């Protein structure tokens, strides 16, 4: 399994990596622009990501805009909704406006508010069907 962790804070990236590393390879991006480039490259190389963990507040292009661009690119490539990359928004923004934007405009799969624990993230990844119970 492949994961793309997108966060401008190194501590958050390390926590997410620690959580996901037992399940697959982790790549990193520090802003939305890098995330879009990494996502497109992986898709074009036929080695797509299974999950993107995306922060919202980042320099350059924020997480909300990056998710919209990723979904737009998937649509242009003819990827059906059931085959789209799973995206978990992992952010300090717990307000309804950001959650609604993530789900309805960006079509995020899930939304977690920081701080998060390893257990909470893995529970969410299980809920979206990427990790199966033994």
Model-identified regions with their sequence ranges:
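Active-site beta3 strand of CheY-like receiver
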Residues: 43-53
């Amino acid at each position: 399994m492949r994961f793309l962790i997108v966060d401008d804070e190194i501590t958050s990236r390390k926590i997410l990596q620690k959580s996901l590393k037992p399940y697959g390879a982790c790549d990193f991006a520090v802003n939305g622009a890098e995330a879009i480039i990494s996502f497109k490259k992986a898709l074009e190389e036929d080695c797509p990501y299974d999950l993107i963990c995306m922060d919202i507040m980042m320099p350059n292009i924020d997480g909300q805009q990056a998710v919209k661009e990723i979904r737009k690119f998937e649509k242009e490539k003819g990827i059906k909704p059931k085959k789209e990359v799973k995206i978990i928004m992992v952010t300090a923004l717990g307000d309804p406006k950001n959650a609604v934007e993530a789900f309805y405009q960006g079509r995020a799969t899930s939304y977690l508010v920081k701080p998060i624990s390893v257990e909470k993230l893995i529970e969410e990844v299980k809920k979206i069907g990427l990790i199966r119970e033994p």
